[in-house]
Amino acid sequence: NCASFGGIPAAAPAPTAGLGVDQLVTDKPVINLPGCPGIPEVYTNTIVHYLVFGQLPELDELKRPKSFYGVTIHDRCLRRPFYEAGKFADSFDDEGYRLGYCLYKLGCKGPTTYNACASIRWMNGLSFPIQSGHPCLGCSEPGFWDGGGFYQGQSAPLDRPGLTAIGAAAGAGVVVGAGMAVANRAQKRGGGEKVE
């Protein structure tokens, strides 16, 4: 993260005005590979991509390879089903934590952090913070040191897409069903055929 976005030297109120390499080197292409610590496979695969194809990989707006930083930790998190079900750990010593519930209320930044931790993992694929019971700190995002307390709980869960889709489908079903009921009543009064 230090080479990509300035890291601790750039954190407030540091007097150093630390910068990322891409803010200093403006006449050459720069690829940011943030993470604290970084994932070795991300480094090696990015280098191999350049050696094999002779070009930089596709990058996001922060100059990170989309193949590794294209989805959030949350998108691939093994605790995501608990998030969708609304099951959260409220403290590091409660029943929800022991059962492996989502760590969002314990400050997990996985929903807003783009990195490959949940798919590649660290230490030769052994684990990553959330799998080991620790909330994501958001270390691959700019300014993560200034992004609030690491264990500061999130006040309300983000929109849960699965539940939103279910709610929208249920609402549409109610509207269609009501429309059919009204049409059937009108048909019965007029002696027409039943609407299906």
Summary of predicted features, one role per range:
Residues 26-32, 46-196:
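Iron-sulfur (Fe-S) cluster-binding modules
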Residues 1-33, 37-39:
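Catalytic cores of nucleophile-dependent amide-cleaving enzymes
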